[in-house]
Amino acid sequence: MMLRGNLKQVRIEKNPARLRALESAVGESEPAAAAAMALALAGEPAPPAPAPPEDHPDEEMGFTIDIKSFLKPGEKTYTQRCRLFVGNLPTDITEEDFKRLFERYGEPSEVFINRDRGFGFIRLESRTLAEIAKAELDGTILKSRPLRIRFATHGAALTVKNLSPVVSNELLEQAFSQFGPVEKAVVVVDDRGRATGKGFVEFAAKPPARKALERCGDGAFLLTTTPRPVIVEPMEQFDDEDGLPEKLMQKTQQYHKEREQPPRFAQPGTFEFEYASRWKALDEMEKQQREQVDRNIREAKEKLEAEMEAARHEHQLMLMRQDLMRRQEELRRLEELRNQELQKRKQIQLRHEEEHRRREEEMIRHREQEELRRQQEGFKPNYMENREQEMRMGDMGPRGAINMGDAFSPAPAGNQGPPPMMGMNMNNRATIPGPPMGPGPAMGPEGAANMGTPMMPDNGAVHNDRFPQGPPSQMGSPMGSRTGSETPQAPMSGVGPVSGGPGGFGRGSQGGNFEGPNKRRRY
């Protein structure tokens, strides 16, 4: 039964010779090997198979294979590794004939023919298909000329040396992808799987490979943290698969001369043995010198790595010091900015305080001026009344100065003498009654004890806390609560009722006990 899709129908031809050739060329998995053998068997023209009857179109003529089965997991298609060189082509071959020669191995992507020199190139889909086509078509007679098929030289491959042990295939491919598309990147390892420090990179075209070679040669391309640059060189191409078969040897005179004797061991003491020994000694010397050179190079590399580690440590310390100095400089600059900001704030605060103090002083000065103005307006008439009161108190009796300082006391007579200081009679401070000791009226023993302090409200009126307003009392009334040691004096002649405000001593009878508001309380 025929399968559809990416499948092709092939003819089956059992040829033991081609079967052995295919088994030696293809060492892949069992399904791939079986499919490869089936493709190889279809190389030579086979006897025409009987055509199936027309009434049975589904009868099988062979078996079908899937081209995708020849792709390895992750393998890219149509790479440089799938490119074949075909030599010894007829000069009259056409491109259609050349394609028809490889049509059984998939659709090619590149076909080039140089008819003058008799060679061409073709690129197949996978490496496995290219190996099958090479194994099948190499040596095939085409127009009486045997074809010579080899894998084409990879002109976009580079050798990478001085790799770090931590570099992998993926890292190598990622590093060189910046120059162009990479088809394959491999780090070479030994039989134990340890990295040898070498690898190769295959680009899809020559321009990216040339660019990578120039850039890495002019500069230092680092793959890891270690400052260890990679060394990039063009890859040396070797054919280690086919080698040099006998059929390709040129039969020259030197060839026939060297082939006169078969392979053998030289016998000791002979001419052959002597020079063979000298050749071996030269090879041994070359080996020793190479080992010495390798040893010197290895020691130099170790020394360089040690110096590099020390220099890296010193460099890190220098970077840390520079970073510390930079941070200190930044902190100092921030501190300066902070100090400047604080200074500005302090100046602003001082200006505010100065302005506030100036405003307070202005308010205090304004308040003082206002108080002074009020005093000048309110105390001027009261001062005249106090003067009149003091002048009137000069003609009063011994107890006349009791109510001095009262703003509502009657003013003294105009014919009296000068008033005593602050309205007090300094000559009447004795507790024993007697004649007055000097000019001026006599003052009672308690005259100065009951002096009030005039109080002036905002309206200019004078009030006395100790002499509240009340009914008028008599000026010379005797005080019944006085002690017996005091002898009340007679009221002064010629002194009538005292005129004044309602808060002065009362008018009227002088007899009886004095019950005025200035009477001392007894506790």
Curated annotation (Swiss-Prot):
Region Disordered, residue ranges: 460-523
Location in or out of the cell: Nucleus speckle; Nucleus, Nucleolus; Nucleus matrix; Cytoplasm
Q: Which GO terms describe its molecular function?
A: RNA binding
Q: What would be one Gene Ontology cellular-component term for the protein?
A: cytoplasm
Primary localisation category = nucleus
**UniProt-reported outcome of changing F200A:** Abolishes accumulation in paraspeckles, but not in perinucleolar caps
Instruction: Cite the record's tissue specificity text.
Output: Expressed in pancreas, kidney, skeletal muscle, liver, lung, placenta, brain and heart.
What parts of the sequence cross the membrane?
none
Concerning SMART domains, the annotation shows:
RRM
The PTM Omega-N-methylarginine maps to R507
Q: Where is this region: Sufficient for perinucleolar caps localization and interaction with NONO?
A: 231-358
Q: Which CDD domains match?
A: NOPS_PSPC1 (cd12949), RRM1_PSP1 (cd12586), RRM2_PSP1 (cd12589)
Q: Residue positions of the PTM Phosphoserine?
A: S409, S473, S477, S509
Stretches with biased composition (Polar residues): 472-490
The record's Gene Ontology biological-process terms are: activation of innate immune response; innate immune response; membraneless organelle assembly; negative regulation of DNA-templated transcription; regulation of circadian rhythm; regulation of DNA-templated transcription; rhythmic process
- The UniProt record lists the keyword Lyase: no
- Name of the protein described by the UniProt record: Paraspeckle component 1
